[in-house]
From Swiss-Prot:
Belongs to the UPF0235 family. InterPro entries: DUF167, YggU-like_sf. SMART domains: DUF167. Pfam families: DUF167. This is UPF0235 protein MA_4097.
Amino acid sequence: MMTYMSFEEAIKTLDSGIIIEIEVTPGSRSLSVPSGYNEWRKRIAVKLTKNAQKGKANEQLIESLAELFGISSSEILINSGATSSKKSLLIKGISYQQAVSVLGARLKE
């Protein structure tokens, strides 16, 4: 079950930027960034059309988030989970409040 009430729990603030906890579904029919919120895992759900081979899904994830937040893809790093569906991303160049605002607007669509 997906809910959008507490998606802020997936976002944390650090001195170097923000961390967003993400759960990726690669090889989906359509690209959906974000596609929902998993309240049990406290992760923003994302659907990617690229398969998880040779970093293609990670590349698509970073490019999609950069476009969503209006920042350079070089400001997004996979902090942990590069080879997992559960990823922790370090994002520079946006504040916690900007992330909540942008993701919240997309999740309510």
